[in-house]
């Protein structure tokens, strides 16, 4: 299959072609969240099974996507976008708080969003791994996005006199790896802790990066 089939145009059932297409795409993504994120998983799902779960035909699948990998790619981006929206809102809401409280609020928002549905965790940290060079590039790009966000918040803390002045990119990259690994393990039941305890541990790690031993805020 070299390309998507053309979807019908015109109004039908009170909906435009674009509205019907968006609805079909949503149904395929919702079905993929269930099949990829729960059982049987991305690698064991077929186009026919996904179409059946969505209540649509395989022909309609090929009107929206070329391959199942395209569906996984779209779903991975969507799950990350949901988490980003939660973090951006938390950053705005916590802007007036001291650094420790601000960091806790931001990471609590991220963790709550990602772990609110175990299927999201599996899409983000499990199913995306090792599929193809294209999806590995996408995964690394999304990780770089989170590194950029941590660096931006660290630099804001520096500007406020709340953190040491330094290049945070390497530390942020390592920290994001810790976040991903700890949340994955917690969700899998391998970590005997509450989500609040996980967030508190991550905040302690972040504060240790931002305020290394011996650092003191500049006296104005």
Give a label for each model feature.
Residues 74, 88-116, 175, 199:
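Hydrophobic alpha-helical connector segments
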Residues 85, 133-159, 169-173, 181, ...:
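Amphipathic alpha-helical packing segments from all-alpha helical-bundle domains
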Residues 123, 179:
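Short, structured motif recognition centered on aromatic/hydrophobic residues
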Residues 20-32, 50, 75-83, 150:
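Generic hydrophobic, amphipathic alpha-helix propensity
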Residues 27, 35-70, 74:
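Helix-turn-helix
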Residues 1-11, 112, 116, 148, ...:
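C-terminal peripheral helix-coil segments that are non-catalytic and often amphipathic
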Residues 20, 65, 69-82, 86, ...:
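Alpha-helical DNA-contacting segments of helix-turn-helix folds
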Residues 90-94, 124-128, 186-190:
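Secondary-structure edge/capping motif, primarily at the C-terminal ends of alpha-helices
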């Amino acid at each position: 299959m070299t390309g998507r089939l053309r979807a019908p145009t015109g109004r039908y059932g009170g909906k435009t072609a674009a509205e019907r297409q968006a609805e079909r795409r949503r149904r395929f993504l919702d079905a993929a969240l269930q099949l990829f994120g729960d059982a049987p998983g991305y690698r064991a799902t077929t186009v026919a099974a996904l179409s059946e779960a969505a209540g649509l035909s395989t022909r309609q699948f090929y009107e929206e996507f070329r391959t199942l990998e395209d569906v996984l790619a779209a779903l991975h981006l969507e799950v990350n976008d949901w988490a980003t929206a939660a973090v951006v809102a938390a950053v705005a809401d916590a802007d007036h708080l001291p650094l420790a409280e601000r960091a806790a609020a931001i990471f609590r928002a991220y963790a709550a969003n990602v772990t609110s549905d175990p299927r999201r965790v599996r899409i983000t940290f499990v199913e995306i791994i090792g599929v193809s060079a294209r999806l590995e590039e996408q995964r690394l790009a999304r990780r770089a996005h989170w590194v950029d966000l941590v660096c931006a918040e660290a630099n804001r803390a520096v500007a406020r006199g709340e953190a040491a002045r330094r290049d945070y990119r390497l530390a942020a990259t390592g920290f994001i790896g810790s976040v991903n690994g700890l949340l994955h393990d917690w969700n899998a039941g391998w970590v005997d802790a509450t989500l609040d305890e996980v967030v508190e541990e991550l905040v302690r790690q972040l504060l240790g990066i931002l305020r290394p031993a011996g650092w003191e805020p500049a006296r104005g």
